[in-house]
């Protein structure tokens, strides 16, 4: 099994001030994406993530891997169908 970073879109439901009204807003971010042995997506992180590293080199590695996600198709987290592991 493998993983990579992917750009993802999801719709957020946002409350309008103190009223009972809501509005929806599309947003984009980076998620970790996990693949089964057939190369199908079986999981993603629930929240968007940001670059992180315990060392400067780890941070650079993470950032560069995240940049690669812009070359892949954007995932639609509202409609994704996850495969089995």
Language-model features: where?
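Residue-level marker of intrinsically disordered, low-complexity segments enriched
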Residues: 14, 39, 47, 78-79, ...
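Short N-terminal "domain-start" leader segments
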Residues: 1-31, 36-38
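Low-complexity intrinsically disordered segments
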Residues: 2-4, 56-85
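A short, exposed loop/beta-hairpin motif centered on an aromatic-Gly-Thr core
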Residues: 41-57
């Amino acid at each position: 099994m493998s993983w990579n970073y992917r750009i993802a879109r999801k719709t957020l439901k946002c409350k309008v001030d103190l009223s009972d009204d809501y509005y929806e807003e599309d947003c984009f971010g980076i998620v970790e994406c996990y693949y089964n042995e057939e190369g199908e997506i079986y999981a993603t992180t629930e929240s968007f993530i940001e670059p992180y590293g315990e060392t400067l080199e780890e941070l650079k590695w993470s950032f560069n891997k995240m940049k690669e996600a812009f070359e892949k198709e954007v995932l639609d987290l509202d409609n994704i169908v996850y495969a089995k592991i």
